[in-house]
Amino acid sequence: MKRGKYHGSLAQALIDAAVVILDAVGIEGVTIRATARAASVSHAAPANHFPDRRALLTAIAVRCFEEMIAGANLAREKATTPAERIVALADAYVAYGLAYPNRYRMMWRMDMLDDSLAALSSIINGMYDSVGDDVAALPSVQRDTATTKLVALSSLIHGYVSMRIDGNFIAAADEATGKPRHIAMIEALIGATNHGGAAAHHPGNR
């Protein structure tokens, strides 16, 4: 492959190649050298875009957050209340994590990412601000408890996805409502159960 093939899109080509490696073997396999080899460029070629592995992993994380948030935003378009938007967002996050476990794990490895990078911090802060507005708008939430409720919600979603990925939980439905377990848990946390706050369609039990 000629070195000029990418015509300025080498960075994206490297990210594409790195994501393929990530999906196949996990974060341990994503190195500058392996990514360059997968992209059919010299080992030195990535240096202009990603000076080290942390920079490459951070760029991958930004890509993955963008993908996950895009899916969540699409799901939220059908929601009409804060509770419905929260459930739709959480459902989309769970679906993404279960579909792409290696990507999901890597996205939260702040010990391996550069969280001072504006692109990463901006997308994460925007994600929390968006759902935080919906949490604060819940009838059951007082303004001075909204942050605690947001942290609880984030912890519930992340913990559930992580335990599903690691095989600690299996796909199951709530015994009382018949809804996917994670939907029932989120509704219980935000006080949406029996208040019309649940999204009408939940594909699959998790």
Model-derived features: where do they sit?
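Amphipathic alpha-helical packing segments from all-alpha helical-bundle domains
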Residues: D114-S140, T147-A152, A176-G191
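N-terminal intrinsically disordered/low-complexity leader segments
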Residues: M1-S9, V20, A79, N194-R206
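Amphipathic alpha-helical segments used for helix-helix packing
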Residues: L98-D115, S162-I170
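Amphipathic alpha-helical linker/stalk segments
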Residues: K2, V62-I86, S121-D133, A137
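Hydrophobic alpha-helical connector segments
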Residues: A59, N73-N102, G126, K149-L153
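Short hydrophobic clusters on alpha-helical segments that form packing/core surfaces
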Residues: L14-L22, V30, C64, M68, ...
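Helix-turn-helix
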Residues: A13, A17, I21-A55, A59
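Amphipathic C-terminal alpha-helical segment
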Residues: S154-A172, A188-A199
